[in-house]
Regions:
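Nucleotidyltransferase catalytic core that binds NTPs
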Residues: 1-189
Length: 189
């Protein structure tokens, strides 16, 4: 995930996300790579095995934005050469657009200059849709859940996978503080 997508990284949020994933039994890799092709290039130094990246539609659309590759002499073509080296596949998680339509690799929109490049990767099987998803989950956004937690709103627990809310509460992640924690003990003013 690119946590810098909305500007500067909130260090506490970043560490809480990593801690939550670890507590849920997931492996977390933290790096200073801001481009996907650099992550792939790094792992290519240690493994000859085929690699895959799972990402959401919005992340894939961003990958096709030339502004991220201006510092490379070969521009976006150099980056994509490194990214798709060794038959890398992108497994694409859908999203809903502003009209509520599900966006997949079949109907996503990239900049007109990138359209043919995207079609090349799609046609050659480099972009594969994740089909096993629950459409109701496409209406849940981490930023919304985080705001609910920080404001002390109810209902955020139901938006998360089983066991996740319990870890957030127990470890007091994302500024979570339940009412019991906010009450002062009897006799203290």
């Amino acid at each position: 995930s690119n946590l810098k997508a909305e500007g500067e990284i909130d260090e506490r949020d970043f560490l809480d996300r990593a801690e939550l994933l670890c507590k849920l039994g997931q492996t977390v890799m933290i790096s200073n790579f801001q481009e996907y092709f650099k992550v792939v290039e790094y792992f290519s130094n240690y493994s000859k095995a085929r690699m895959g990246l799972a990402m959401g539609v919005s992340n894939l659309v961003e990958i096709f934005d030339e502004k991220y590759y201006r510092h490379l002499s070969g521009g976006i073509l150099e980056a994509f050469g490194k990214l798709f080296y060794r038959d890398l596949k992108v497994y694409l998680y859908p999203m809903k657009d502003e009209n509520g339509n599900v966006v997949t690799s079949e109907n996503l929109k990239v900049h007109p200059r990138m359209k043919e490049l995207y079609k090349f990767f799609k046609f050659n099987g480099k972009v594969i849709d994740i089909k096993d998803y629950d459409e109701k989950n496409l209406d849940i956004f981490s930023r919304k859940v985080l705001k609910m937690i920080c404001k002390g709103e109810t209902g955020w627990e139901e938006l998360l996978p089983e066991g996740t809310a319990e870890v957030i509460k127990k470890e007091k992640l994302f500024s979570y503080a339940c009412e019991l924690d906010l009450k002062e003990p009897e006799g203290i003013k």
